[in-house]
Amino acid sequence: MKTGKPDNPKNPESLLFPPILPPTKPVPQTGDDPYIFLYGGLLAAALIGGSVFAVYYFKKGKYSRTSLKRTAVGVSVLSLCVLVALGSGFLVFRDLNQYAESKDAYRDLAGYVEVPEQTASPESAPDPTEPKRDDTDIVLPSVDFETLRENGPDIIGWLSLPDTVLNYPVTQTDNNEYYLNHLYDGTYNKVGCLFADYENQADFSDRNTIIYGHNMRDGSMFALLNRYDEQSYFDAHRQMYLVTPKGGYVMEIFAAFAAKPEESGSETSPWQLSWKDDGAYTTWLTAMKERSAVESDVTVTCSDKVLTLSTCTPGGTGRFLVMGKLVKVDNEI
């Protein structure tokens, strides 16, 4: 509630009492590390440059007093090239090794998760007034959460997109930074892990639950989300599956679009977590659907719960989001 005249630019009190704006929470940086290309470029430049200098200065075999200074320069440059090659080579190896380690780590979870080989989508969208449905043609992944949590105690769910590499655990901790560079078991790794916003409820009961994940160049994690700006890809992948310790859900995708992290904190932010009433939530849902880069026949109302998947756009400056409503699947997991 505004009091006095703090908003009047002619009032000197406005300098002392500026308008109070809602806090803006930073959106996690979920792009892949761009420096592997720099490391690779330095390695190539060092190897090529070193080879050129080696041939130019030592092939002639001139080591007289008059050429001593020139030879010293050549040795110095060659030594620098060797050092750069060793350093950049190590960094390239480190990054590639982390890719391999992450793949091995997630492959180790295969024994705790049984993903059906064949899945089918329902022929038509469900009645939006019906919170549950009995879909005998939908077979969710079977997840042994008890054993899974022995390896990753912060795991709260499992997200999968049939017939793709997107098949990962979802974690959550008390911040949005830790799992940007740690695997589900706490191992440091730049690939990180999918994780829910720390302000969300762990049971996915909020109106909007956000899951963040990296856009990795090797195609892992949330890399394929950026393909949802293509209508053909969306048409072939309209649903994802979310399994939790308390049940399973179908994520029926209704919107996919790019956004700027600066939008966080605004009324139309896709990362919004709370609304003052049903009307505000309905307005937000409509705005999200209107922003979509693809056409979807999925309807959303104020009674629906939304799952928002957030990753970086290529280049890392923007964000790409895929949004869907969660529909409880009323069958055995």
Give the label of every model feature segment.
Residues M1-T129, C312, E332:
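Gram-positive cell-envelope targeting signals
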Residues A85-I333:
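Solvent-exposed, non-transmembrane regions of membrane-associated and secreted proteins
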